[in-house]
From Swiss-Prot:
The gene is hldD. One of its GO terms (molecular function) is ADP-glyceromanno-heptose 6-epimerase activity. It comes from Nitratidesulfovibrio vulgaris (strain ATCC 29579 / DSM 644 / CCUG 34227 / NCIMB 8303 / VKM B-1760 / Hildenborough) (Desulfovibrio vulgaris). Pathway: Nucleotide-sugar biosynthesis; ADP-L-glycero-beta-D-manno-heptose biosynthesis; ADP-L-glycero-beta-D-manno-heptose from D-glycero-beta-D-manno-heptose 7-phosphate: step 4/4. It comes from the Bacteria. This is ADP-L-glycero-D-manno-heptose-6-epimerase. Pfam families: Epimerase (PF01370). Binds 1 NADP(+) per subunit. Catalyzes the interconversion between ADP-D-glycero-beta-D-manno-heptose and ADP-L-glycero-beta-D-manno-heptose via an epimerization at carbon 6 of the heptose. Its cofactor is NADP(+). Belongs to the NAD(P)-dependent epimerase/dehydratase family. HldD subfamily. The lineage of its organism: Bacteria, Pseudomonadati, Thermodesulfobacteriota, Desulfovibrionia, Desulfovibrionales. NADP(+) binds at residues 10-11, 31-32, 38, 53, 75-79, 92, 147, 171, 179. Signal peptide: none annotated. One of its GO terms (biological process) is carbohydrate metabolic process.
């Protein structure tokens, strides 16, 4: 049995899609659907059971999972970088993850955890996923800090020898529609361009970057789940790994790709960055991918223009945009 926490969410539901693509349906989806639209991410998927997050947490707390579990893909977390409730993040992103990791270690189940590139803070220490760098990182927001604390705990307790914790960079692609303000700029741009014919980006607050010239490592969600599938097949590959393309691109590049995919000429306007984001905004991110490559991962990452074109034309423009 495979358990996917956050299985109705963005990357989680994409992982359920990948498992289905590989002929696997013995899947338990763990999530908190509440009043969100996440349920739509599951309509096309095949799995044996859905368990509410709180019920699952009780099972984990008592060490009493009613399945013979092969692997847990732990994508369940609060992923809002703007979340300000630190106690909630500590409980949801740290304590819950530690308990689940311990249970997997005890039972021999494969454990793959979602960390984040938000752990790298302002990037002044670079974006290396080696353990020495990890010890010195200073995240800019509480979300990144909660993810950093799990990785530090796993390192300190010797758990990184038996799990994979993945620092996802800027992920985009189908099944992110429920995320509101946390949707990728591609998803937002498609709607804004369709309605107004223009896309607005934040002006740069960094003297080294022009407006729209801030750079991020954008990775297609299908590539993320390919990496996780490979890790499931290679349980001896463990540690903290970056999951990005290793090639930073500008916001202008990204938005231009959306315009091109929509067969429109780019029209970009720049607006002031909200006060609450200033000082907490990463102007540059680029994954160092040597560690994952050296471990033997063969996944070839999709070029930005190709990923954006597929996302726009195959999904965003479709009657059913879901995987």
């Amino acid at each position: 049995m495979y358990i996917v926490t956050g299985g109705a969410g963005f990357i989680g539901s994409a992982m359920v899609w990948k498992l289905n693509e590989m002929g696997i349906e013995d899947i338990v989806v763990v999530d908190n659907l509440s009043t969100s639209e996440k349920w739509k991410n599951l309509v096309n998927r095949r799995y044996v059971d859905y368990v509410h997050r709180d019920t699952f947490m009780d099972m984990v707390l008592h060490g009493d999972l009613p399945w013979d579990v092969d692997a847990v893909v732990h994508m369940g977390a609060c992923s809002a970088t703007t979340e300000r409730d630190a106690d909630f993040l500590m409980e949801n992103n740290l304590r819950y993850s530690r308990m689940l990791c311990e249970l997997c270690m005890e039972t021999g189940a494969r454990f793959i955890n979602a960390s984040s590139a938000a752990t790298y803070g302002d990037g002044s220490l670079g974006f290396s996923d080696d353990d020495t760098t990890m010890l010195r990182l200073k995240p800019l927001n509480m979300y990144g800090y909660s993810k950093q604390l799990f990785d530090l705990w796993a390192y300190r307790e010797g758990r990184l020898d038996g799990i994979a914790s993945l620092k996802f960079f800027n992920v985009y692609g189908p099944n992110e529609y429920h995320k509101g303000d946390m949707r990728s700029v591609i998803c937002k741009a498609y709607a804004q361009i369709g309605q107004e014919g223009v896309m607005r980006l934040f002006r740069s607050c960094h003297p080294d970057y022009a407006d729209g010239g801030q750079m991020r490592d954008f990775i297609y969600v299908k590539d993320c789940v390919e990496v996780m599938w490979w890790l499931l097949q290679n349980p001896g590959v463990n540690g903290v790994f970056n999951v990005g393309t290793g090639k930073a691109r500008t916001w202008n590049d990204l938005v231009t790709a959306v315009f091109r995919a929509m067969d429109r000429e780019p029209v970009i306007e720049y607006i002031d960055m909200p006060e609450q984001l200033r000082g907490k905004y990463q102007s540059f991110t680029e994954a160092t991918m040597g560690k994952l490559r050296d471990a033997g991962c063969p996944v070839r990452f999709t070029e930005l223009e190709d990923g954006v074109t597929e996302y726009v034309r195959r999904y965003l423009a479709a009657a059913d945009p879901h995987l």
